[in-house]
């Protein structure tokens, strides 16, 4: 049977992979969005694990709210990305300096 430590280690590994993905790839906006989503999912795994092992449903309900916000974040982020790609023909982070004043 899987213990709480197994789930916490899995969450920590996924969180570390997302941090490495953010630091190693600062060029592509799509990869940055995927790394942020992976980070949120790692936190959700920890919420569900603690909620299950403590016998409290509040953590599992909180995960549904986090997933809803993450879905909205992804939709808005990809919509902004599509507009930027149509206007600038690139998704490179270094080329997205049009907001500089």
UniProtKB/Swiss-Prot annotation:
One of its GO terms (molecular function) is NADH:ubiquinone reductase (non-electrogenic) activity. The chain crosses the membrane at residues 4-24, 30-50, 61-81. It is found in: Cell inner membrane. It is a multi-pass membrane protein. Gene3D superfamilies: 1.10.287.3510. InterPro entries: NADH_UbQ_OxRdtase_chain4L/K, NUOK/Mnh_C1-like. This is NADH-quinone oxidoreductase subunit K.
